[in-house]
Amino acid sequence: MAKDIKFSENARRSLLKGVDKLADTVKTTIGPKGRNVVLEQSYGNPDITNDGVTIAKSIELKDRYENMGAKLVAEAAQKTNDIAGDGTTTATVLTQAIAREGMKNVTAGANPVGIRRGIEKATKAAVDELHKISHKVESKDQIANVAAVSSASKEIGALIADAMEKVGHDGVITIEDSRGINTELSVVEGMQFDRGYLSQYMVTDNDKMEADLDNPYILITDKKISNIQDILPLLQEIVQQGKSLLIIADDITGEALPTLVLNKIRGTFNVVAVKAPGFGDRRKAQLQDIAALTGGTVITEDLGLELKDTKIDQLGQARRITVTKDSTTIVGGAGSKEAIDERVDTIRKQIEDSTSDFDKKKLQERLAKLTGGVAVIHVGAATETELKERRYRIEDALNSTRAAVDEGYVAGGGTALVNVEKAVREVKGETTDEQTGINIVLRALSAPVRQIAENAGKDGSVILDKLEHQENEIGYNAATDKWENMVDAGIIDPTKVTRTALQNAASIAALLLTTEAVVAEIPEPKQAAPQGGAGAPMGM
């Protein structure tokens, strides 16, 4: 296919137009008074959301050059979401601010490479200062505050704090749709291990790239499955029952994996395959843990069992299983309390007898998985549209809370980014262009505060001017229209979210500034369909 190429100023201007179109859409959602965005769906009702990454991913622009600019900003949002789980709107606002200022200076004749170096220096100084002013998460109230700010709901904040209290900061918390209108929390038997699906064609939710199995059977084995004939009688029985299947095996190779994938795509039955967790003897022990939890039997030569002889009653079961590319979460295993308790007692005795700190640590991890359970947040709402929007907010809040536990928290509402300006001002560029890059980041740091104020109906410049004359952590609370200590008021952001948003924004914006050519495909004209000739007159 033929290509069209734009150079220098023309290329950057086209990219910036795309940046602006996406950012102007996303930034209306930032802050407690942020608006919602309605997204058209290819089928069904439209989505109403204020989730930055969801909006960014849904935008496709007609102009190919503008679309490339939009996709670069969406990448900053997506990377921030992948690392920190939230902060996508902040990343978008910062990317636009740095890119806009940078483009002005490059157009005026500044060297983009020098500007990029300045941006990188300023970003490092800002990130270092963020870590210095960060607070550790030490109480349930602080967890609730982080979640409440992210979701704009004290009710959701309290729910997530309760969930973390019940299963621990490192515990497994999942989100499910409720059949009622209330959002509730429950703790069920379950565990999570760090193995994901063997093929992306096994996913059932393409937006989240997850595979969800309801009331599935679970085949647990330490063997390799390479010949589909070994498990064919078992598969046929499962298909007849209309059930889904999770296969946990040493590996699935040869014709077995493509055969399973083909049957999944054709809709014969819902199947997901994952590799068994752990290695060596630890792998066998972990498989026994999963078997105890789900009421299954490990198909292993150690017990004289063969795959071809496996019966349905040797399979485990669970209420729900969610598999991502990196992990598998089992919720509501069908194992008996007696079997689980017996397994727990065995592990506790092994911990007492172990003389190796490393072995003890691994045994304690297994014990925690068997005894900790899984916290399930059942999301309720009156309508399907409201349910989706509420679920997005709870997912963001949960991710924010985990980020705060990892790296602590800073004053929210964009206040922390303005507070680090002093540290950035102390950074001096070696050249005029480097200094220009530093100044660009300095101006961009105030962009989130400006936008939060404007979304609340205030003049962003007036709010910013007043904020820059306040002590650290004193900021503008857009929710109450008051000036107060943001940390004391519970308006806090995870340090990891703020840091990641700034780093990704600076990285993508710097790439935009140093772009000298953009290559796009020229769409081939659609050939007109041949017109049919006039038919012969019908005889009488």
Curated annotation (Swiss-Prot):
Alphabetical list of InterPro entries matching this protein: Chaperonin_Cpn60_CS, Cpn60/GroEL, Cpn60/GroEL/TCP-1, GroEL-like_apical_dom_sf, GROEL-like_equatorial_sf, TCP-1-like_intermed_sf
Molecular function GO labels: ATP binding; ATP-dependent protein folding chaperone; isomerase activity; unfolded protein binding
CDD domains named in the record: GroEL
Binding site for ATP: T29, I30, G31, P32, D86, G87, T88, T89, T90, G413, N477, A478, A479, D493
Catalyzed chemical reaction(s): ATP + H2O + a folded polypeptide = ADP + phosphate + an unfolded polypeptide
A single GO cellular-component term on record: cytoplasm
EC top class named in words: isomerase
Keywords: ATP-binding, Chaperone, Cytoplasm, Isomerase, Nucleotide-binding
Known EC number: 5.6.1.7
One GO BP: positive regulation of interleukin-8 production
Compartment annotation: Cytoplasm
Record's function text: Together with its co-chaperonin GroES, plays an essential role in assisting protein folding. The GroEL-GroES system forms a nano-cage that allows encapsulation of the non-native substrate proteins and provides a physical environment optimized to promote and accelerate protein folding.
Subunit-level organization: Forms a cylinder of 14 subunits composed of two heptameric rings stacked back-to-back. Interacts with the co-chaperonin GroES.
Record-stated family: Belongs to the chaperonin (HSP60) family.
Name of this chain's protein: Chaperonin GroEL
Organism: Lactobacillus helveticus
